[in-house]
Amino acid sequence: MMTEWMNKWLMAIFCWMIFMPVPDLLAQSAKTKDDPRITLRMKEVSLPEVLSEIERQAGVTFSYESSLLKELPKISFQVKDEALTDCLTRLFESYPIVHKVSGKIVILKRRQRQVTISGFVRDQASSESLIGASVYEVASRKGSATNSYGFFSLTLPPGNIRLHASYIGYESCSFNFTELDRDTILNIELRPNARLEEVVVTASERDRLSVNNTLMGTMEFSQKTIKATPTLFGESDIVKTLQLTPGVASGTEGLAGLYVRGGDQDGNLFLIDGNPVYQINHVGGLFSAFNPEAIRNLDFFKAGFPARYGGRLSSVVDVHTKEGNMKEYHGSATIGLISGNLSLEGPIIKDRTAFQIALRRSWLDVLSAPAIAIANKVRKDGHKINLRYAFHDLNLKLNHRFSDRSRMFFSLYNGNDVLKGGGTDFSTEEEQVPYTDGTHSSLRWGNLMGTLGWTYVFNNRLFGRVSGVFSRYRSNVRSSKEYNYGVEGEDNYLSSSSETSSSTSILDMGVRSSFDYTPSTSHVIRFGGDFLMHRFRPEYNEVKAAGSGMLEFSNIGKIYTNDLLWAREAAIFGEDDWNVLPSLRLNAGIRFSLFNVERKAYTLLEPRASLRWLLRDDLSFKASYARMGQYIHLLGNSYINLPTDAWMPVTRKLKPLISDQVSAGFYYNLMRSYSFSVEGYYKWMKNLLDYKDGYSFLPGTAAWEEKMAVGKGRSYGVEFLARKESGRTTGWIGYTLSWSDRRFDEIDNGRRFPARYDNRHKLNIVVSHKLSEKVELTAAWTYTSGNRMTLSLESYEQAGTLTISNQYKMNNWWEPSGEVVDLYTRRNNYQMPAYHRLDLGLNIYRPKKKGRMGIWNISIYNVYSRMNPFMVYKSDNWERTNNLVPGSSSPYNGKTKPCFKLIGIMPIIPSISYTYKF
């Protein structure tokens, strides 16, 4: 009953959000309804003849200079029962004429020739492009925001023009043009604002504060914001930062999981400079593969997706790396408990070519090696252990500017993890026959990615980007065993060895292109296309075995292998960000994609639309619809994203995943630097995959397609966000109320069941406060309703009799003596306890000579040491379900209720790191 009531309440809110602006829309359209209706069917006539007929039907008079209509060609014009305003707009759109209706008078004037001002907005200190900077004309308040490469284009009437450029965290500046009558290139350099006092956020920056643009479910994070978030082991992490935003579930305690608006782990598209990343985890998910020292900023989309993005259902994380300083050399070095970080940037050719390199490496293996060596040395029991884990990241960016119009860049990312472990038993001095018995295992995984891109300003209104991309992910699990007994050459000598290897990989190669065309200040048109060649090796297993001496043999073979799968993916897209009216802005786009695999071609048409209705200067209503398609899936053994999980494409049997999402919400700005939003959403998903009951992704069993069930899902909810982006105190408060469920015909008898991360409530509070120029305090508190999992809540004894446990008198536990069979009644039938945690961080800045800086970071993860459950396991003891006391005459029904134990692994964890900037 409670769930039904909450569903109705949520839908009522959602409907209210959608229909709230209707009165305003009706009021706006009232003028159109009052307009006279015009019907014309005229062929090869002069424009004055058309105007005379309109005057007759509408009862209006046209006022214009006689020279305005001279030497205009004859036209054919046809409308049927159309409002006067719309009729005139269509009539004059192909003429250099503008009109204005004033009562019964229609004034015609010559359209002024337009001039275009275009260029780049850059950081004055480094010449790096500033993404999302605001450039606007003061008098008309017409403006533009820079694209992902810092480019802007403004088309304005000629004359006296005053431009204003601004970007949060930088000093704004203005430019005056007197009687400007030609297209002009203007490259703007903004100076970083080092002052502590509040940065003024102008009305033109409303785009960045989400009131004026059409974007929904979108957040932008700078490197500074990411670093200001309290960290685990002193390691800043973009995924951990995203986990603190509304609508995002983190999954398992401490790991870099991302489950967005009821989606799955594989529904997130991670991009580094436009190139997809398939495995984002280090240390099993404690850290992500994104080195914060290499990041310039990132855009996070979870609704209202622009048409240029595709390939995943749930979200897009678009990461832009640093371009490199073209003026001076700068760098930083960080020492933490888990890893070290070194970055360097600077000019190769001043103001022409720059580089940026960032290297991160863990030293868990370095720190643990002496301890393991000492332990092995002091042990006298004939046993040695070996354990090693290490990871590294390398980010490299080369950036060359041929001219103000042309630029080329190369971006490289390489990240690898290595985990090795094992042990060896060997004979001691007391034993007569020497022997060794060793077992060793290793797990390796990593990404290698490269992007070669070229950007070019074709003219003042057209900007283009073309890039070639390469991306490879692979993992390998290897296990070996070696046994030697006796002395080689003697009769009793024998030796055997075996090795098994399992690997998975995915490789992409392709071309991406995108273009920004700005015909006027009312339109920004983006279009382009992608082509990718995929190569999948979902599973390759090999075994080797050999023996000598008394055990002579040799064998090499495959045990279960999926063949290589090749697939081709292509897409074209187009979108128009259009200021329809001063208060109405529309972003309409479409994406068409094709995926060819196993001689089967799938096509998807993905329409996208977002609108913004400006109710006041500081308040807007938005609504959006987006269809997303996904052609690849991630298959694994658990809910933790393991390196051994395999990416698989759609097949002849399994169709592409599709989601349709509608969103609506209000956005409000207060006192320049505060922004508030409330969004409601409803998302339908189909062709989802999950394992059938009793199956998992294990080698040597049925083909993977046969293990999968195909079903549907839905998620809906409301998200609230309050954010402050400037001043001494910054941060956000976010709350999410959401539902998410699934339905598969072959799972749970076709009944709906809650999704794994169906977290009803989520609350996040993130605060950063500058106590002074040298001290910054950060805090983050999160609360989430418990995750769900499938457990056997009852067990059945097949044979034997129930006996009272010796522990019964203390614990009221029963212990079955026969074979016990687990009973699974529903999928995801158990909800874990709520999750909550407080993290604190302290940054101490120590200025040095010549602009150098030392930064101490002290972090405390899980301040009050809440042992949030990481896993649940079943106890060996059982509780009887019929609640009979010993000695009761009632027969035992054969069912028992198990006792469960919750395991938490992340207590309070203090950490410290030191960064030296030069």
PLM regions and their residue ranges:
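Short, acidic, small-residue-rich periplasmic hinge/interaction motif at the N-terminus
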Residues: 28, 51, 55-58, 95, ...
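Periplasmic N-terminal accessory/gating domains of Gram-negative outer-membrane beta-barrel systems
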Residues: 142, 171, 200-306, 316, ...
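C-terminal beta-signal and adjacent terminal beta-strands/loops
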Residues: 366, 774, 783-809, 818, ...
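Short, acidic Ser/Thr/Gly-rich low-complexity loop/linker segments typical of extracellular
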Residues: 140-151
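Gram-negative outer-membrane beta-barrel transporters
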Residues: 682-684, 702, 706-793
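Surface-exposed extracellular loop regions of Gram-negative outer-membrane beta-barrel proteins
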Residues: 474, 542, 617-662, 682-705, ...
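Transmembrane beta-barrel wall of Gram-negative outer-membrane proteins
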Residues: 338-361, 377-422, 442-464, 470, ...
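Outer membrane beta-barrel strand-and-loop segments of large Gram-negative receptors
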Residues: 504, 508-510, 560-565, 571, ...
